[in-house]
Design a protein with these regions (language model features):
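Active-site hotspot residues in diverse enzymes, especially metal/ion-binding acidic/histidine motifs
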Residues: 1-145
Length: 145
């Protein structure tokens, strides 16, 4: 994919988690390294989702800045989260853990070393692709739509 990834401490005050942009045909992802490592992985995957899915919005050097990567009010942010969840988390790992005897939402997220809000995107994606499992939200709600 050819992406320059930069870990930065420059955005600690304003809460910026990460951003991506395309300048002179070079793709950039900047991640706030003051976040826990598991959050940095999520932000990296989320920004990769923007670079792949939202090229049009990034034309002309525009940046997609993320202060809340779990934002569900924006279609573009949801798409980037679903991309990241499917890219970073293997379906088989989720299925194996969900079928263990002491599986619950939070334990599985912890075992996968991912934040629980991010795990909700993975479960929702898997249910939409036909997997049957318990999910933490009512799928008839507007939470991820």
């Amino acid at each position: 994919m050819g992406v320059v990834v930069v870990a930065s401490n420059a955005y600690t005050r304003n809460g910026l988690r990460g951003y991506c942009t395309i300048m002179n045909k070079t793709r950039y992802v900047v991640i706030n390294q003051k976040q826990p490592e598991e959050e940095q992985r999520v932000v990296a995957g989320h920004e990769a989702g923007h670079l792949i899915l939202h090229k049009t919005q990034l034309k002309g050097g525009a940046a997609m800045q993320d202060f809340d990567v779990y934002n569900v009010s924006s279609r573009l942010e949801r798409q980037a989260n679903f991309f990241a969840a499917d890219f970073l988390i293997d379906d088989g790992d989720v299925l194996d853990l969900m079928h263990s005897r002491d599986a619950d939402f939070f334990n599985v997220a912890k075992e996968l070393c991912i934040p629980s809000p991010f795990f909700a995107f993975k479960l929702y994606s898997m249910v939409n692709r036909g997997h049957s499992m318990r999910v933490p939200v009512d799928l008839n709600s507007t939470f991820l739509k």
